[in-house]
Amino acid sequence: MTSTAQPAPPVPQTKAWIITGPTSGMGHVAALELAKHGTVVLVGRGKLAEVEAEINALPDGHAVSVVCDFADIHSVRRAAAQIVALGLPLAGVANNAGMMSTTDGRKSPHGWDLSFATNHLGPFAFTEALIPHLPDGANVVFTCSGVEDSECKPAVVSGFRGGRYISAETSARGEWKPGGSTKAGYDAYATSKQGNLATVFRLAREIPRLHFRAVEPGFNPGTNLGRDASPFLQFIAKRVLSPMAPMIKYWSTPKIAGRLIATTLTDTSDATGVYYDENGKLMQASKQVSDPVFSDRYVAETRELLATVPAEEEKRVPR
């Protein structure tokens, strides 16, 4: 008897979501949330293998890891190329990796200010390398910060004086507009996060087929952002301040912030060029970065600076 059974249809590939900085804090929470929506591409350093195993152990969980040092543009370009080579159906990118140095003078492999390179230059280069491979309607999310706004009262009280951008070149040298913060690392952090917002606003105008979104996760004392702070200060932040966060305005927790990042990345609306606060409500950026002339200049100068980093020479295969 001849069987009339039809072959089973191929199993469709699930969407793949890229998230950087997924090994701790809000990034870790976001990665676990994204696992509910498809494959998670974990990009960063440190405990990538542990998070990958954690997600793969979940029912229907699937994750892959790509090592990347966002302060090193060569590493960033390699990571983007590796992701493209995976052949996954990419659906969106969450640029969450970042740092806040509490000391001045730290440099990237290219000799650039470490915070500016890690928070802005690296994620910008990463995003630009992936854009041609993202489908229409894909979301690109940047974790930003209200400290870029010199009129943000909580940020000012904390010692920030807003973004101190002069040019991409001077920022890379660790030089900032006079009148900034007296606290080491604050101007670098605020200026780099202003760069993230400039990127969102400029690319939303430049590339309408994609959706660019910014998220202000609120003050999160439970993250590893200030990981070069003293062990005592890290203990106070995570064990004393973090539990209080839900009760204080403008504060948040890694769990709340991580879910917000995942929700913003997987949202199917057409929203682009938008900026969400820690509660997922629309918020206003600084007057400076909201000016298209300023954000256009910031992005143009970023591209010019990154163009000075030559492509890596292909490794010759011995014959």
Go through each PLM region and give its residues.
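C-terminal helical subdomain
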Residues: 239-283, 292-297, 304
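C-terminal helix-and-tail extensions that cap enzymatic domains
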Residues: 17, 32, 274-319
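Alpha-helical packing segments of well-folded alpha/beta enzyme cores
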Residues: 79, 195, 199, 257-260, ...
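Short aromatic-enriched loop/helix-cap "lid" or pocket-rim segments at secondary-structure transitions
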Residues: 152-156, 224-229, 287-289
